Amino acid sequence: MYLLVDVGNTHSVFSITEDGKTFRRWRLSTGVFQTEDELFSHLHPLLGDTMREIKGIGVASVVPTQNTVIERFSQKYFHISPIWVKAKDGCVKWNVKNPSEVGADRVANVVAFVKEYGKNGIIIDMGTATTVDLVVNGSYEGGAILPGLFMMVHSLFRGTAKLPLVEVKPADFVVGKDTEENIRLGVVNGSVYALEGIIGRMKEVYGDLPVVLTGGQSKIVKDMIKHEIFDEDLTIKGVYHFCFGD
């Protein structure tokens, strides 16, 4: 049994699998565990006796301050050194200026895509930030980063005197008739339009590539963005393939 961890800025996903095909997963707020013992106190009730079966731990983290917690947790409770996801040559080539700057979550997504769906495609991951990644002939060619949906609404709320904090959901109208509708239209629908523009330009240059959609906020716009594949476990699958796959 393997423990797979995706440490994000807002939430962290913990998943267990035997074969990299079926996954059980749990989502925790990243800020709730500041020590290895706090992390154990949250995970032990969820994993139960399964913890005794863990023989490997793989981690994709974009929060460096949590890496020490994960390392100590792995050593103290499993006597295992975790394997960390990072860009390196293997099943994927990294055709960017500084591969070490590519976030571990994006590395995991690209590895999972190449392993499971093919060597050509576009990956949209909607989390705290929204990322777009391009894979051509098994080579990671780069991508784009946008603010995430919740980041946008919180930014408007915190950065202004009067704008409210609104529910993040799609707008089914062309123009907003009150402040809340204006924000929803600008944030949610505006993000979709931006993604469509980025994807459209990539397809003009690289061909009609399939699009895979993933990420904790992707369900909000799932019916608005044209995509061929929806895979909410893409990042976790990538952690498995990178750390324990062939």
Curated annotation (Swiss-Prot):
InterPro entries listed in its UniProt record: ATPase_NBD (IPR043129), Type_III_PanK (IPR004619)
Any GO MF annotation of the entry: pantothenate kinase activity
Active site: D105 (proton acceptor)
Protein residues bound to K(+): D125
GO cellular component, one term: cytoplasm
Pfam families, per the entry: Pan_kinase
Reaction it catalyzes: (R)-pantothenate + ATP = (R)-4'-phosphopantothenate + ADP + H(+)
Binding locations of ATP: D6, V7, G8, N9, T10, H11, S12, V13, T128
Residues noted as binding substrate in the record, renumbered to the chain: G103, A104, D105, R106, T179
Enzyme Commission designation: 2.7.1.33
Source organism superkingdom: Bacteria
Cofactors named for this entry: NH4(+); K(+)
Cofactor note: A monovalent cation. Ammonium or potassium.
Keywords: ATP-binding, Coenzyme A biosynthesis, Cytoplasm, Kinase, Metal-binding, Nucleotide-binding, Potassium, Transferase
Protein task: Catalyzes the phosphorylation of pantothenate (Pan), the first step in CoA biosynthesis.
Recorded family membership: Belongs to the type III pantothenate kinase family.
Subunit and interaction comment: Homodimer.
Name the UniProt record assigns to this protein: Type III pantothenate kinase
Gene name tied to this protein: coaX
